[in-house]
């Protein structure tokens, strides 16, 4: 994640410059991609914001593992809930902007000189496809965070249970604690032996952790669904780019074959001219050889 945006977007400026150079070299008016790249920059800024929030969630999750106080867990829960809500908001904005970019690309193909396979179209399609791939990386990162949080929550509940009861909880007990959050029901023996006040903080802490994990998981599932909605767009752009590259490759192949055939024709033409010259020269030589013996007789007749 640290290097996710450090160098990925440098190519967009290069692609823009290349598209403009291609248009100039082909004798066409340079296509205006400024608005397109301005929209791309907006998407990039939102994606960087999502990355920052992801790091904040990571840090809060790490801090939560070392906390043993229900009040502090509650504070961290509120912070993480806020971060996830911001992530959802930004990702939904990114989705809308990606869809708008894809629509703009489709409209651009109707402009003269910007049709499928043109340098402008290849640039637009490549950039949108690249943005989609970065979103895929983000999606995988959040899925990984969600899995880690669930696994770490389970480990924390196991440790707290052992600390209070001195017993190793079986898998079913841990699953029941995690699914219900009703830790008091599973700690009756400890409450009877130590008193409710002795373990109240731990019970509250487990409850806060349960509520935090469930709420964050619900939001992360919603976030994942938004990512999945964008996956179709990413796949479509990737396939479109592959189709364009395939057409360009085929066109280049046809051009190369045409050039080779033209070169062969020129060589054949040169060869034909050469042999024609040889034939004419041979005819002249033969004619001269036939004419020389008869030349005295012809001269006598002329006299």
From Swiss-Prot:
Family that this chain belongs to: Belongs to the syntaxin family.
Gene label: SYP124
Transmembrane segments: 280-300
Cited CDD domains: SNARE_syntaxin1-like, SynN
This protein's record includes keyword Transmembrane helix: yes
Listed name of the protein: Syntaxin-124
Family annotation (SUPFAM superfamilies): t-snare proteins
Function in brief: Vesicle trafficking protein that functions in the secretory pathway.
Compartments in which it is found: Membrane
Sequence segments annotated as region (Disordered): 107-126
Topological category with respect to the lipid bilayer: Single-pass type IV membrane protein
GO BP annotations listed: intracellular protein transport; pollen tube growth; vesicle-mediated transport
Disulphide-bridged cysteine pairs: none
Assembly, per entry: Part of the t-SNARE complex.
Residues forming coiled coils: 31-112
Domain t-SNARE coiled-coil homology: 203-265
GO MF assignments: SNAP receptor activity
Principal cellular location given in the protein's record: membrane
Side Cytoplasmic, residues: 1-279
PANTHER family: SYNTAXIN, SYNTAXIN-124-RELATED
């Amino acid at each position: 994640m640290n290097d996710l945006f450090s160098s990925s977007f440098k190519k967009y400026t290069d692609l823009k410059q290349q598209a403009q150079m291609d248009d100039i070299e082909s004798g066409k008016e340079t296509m205006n991609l400024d608005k397109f790249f301005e929209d791309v920059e907006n998407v990039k800024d939102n994606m960087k914001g999502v990355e920052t929030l992801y790091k904040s969630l990571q840090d809060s999750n790490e801090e939560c593992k070392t906390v043993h106080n229900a009040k502090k867990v509650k504070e961290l829960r509120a912070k993480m809930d806020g971060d996830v809500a911001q992530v959802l908001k930004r990702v939904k904005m990114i989705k809308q902007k990606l869809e708008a970019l894809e629509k703009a690309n489709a409209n651009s193909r109707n402009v003269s000189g910007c049709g499928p396979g043109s340098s402008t179209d290849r640039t637009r399609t490549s950039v949108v496809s690249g943005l989609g791939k970065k979103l895929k990386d983000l999606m995988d990162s959040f899925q990984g965070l969600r899995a880690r949080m669930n696994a770490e929550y389970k480990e924390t509940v196991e440790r707290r249970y052992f600390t209070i009861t001195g017993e190793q909880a079986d898998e079913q007990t841990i699953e029941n604690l995690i699914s219900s959050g009703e830790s008091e029901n599973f700690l009756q023996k400890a409450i009877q032996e130590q008193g409710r006040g002795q373990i109240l903080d731990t019970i509250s802490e487990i409850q806060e952790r349960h509520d935090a994990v469930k709420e964050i998981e619900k939001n992360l599932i919603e976030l994942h669904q938004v990512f999945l909605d964008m996956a179709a767009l990413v796949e479509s752009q990737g396939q479109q780019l592959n189709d364009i590259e395939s057409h360009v490759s085929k066109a280049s192949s046809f051009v190369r074959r045409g050039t080779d055939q033209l070169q062969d024709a020129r060589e054949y033409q040169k060869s034909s001219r050469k042999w024609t010259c040889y034939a004419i020269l041979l005819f002249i030589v033969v004619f001269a050889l036939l004419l020389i013996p008869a030349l005295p007789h012809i001269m006598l007749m002329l006299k």
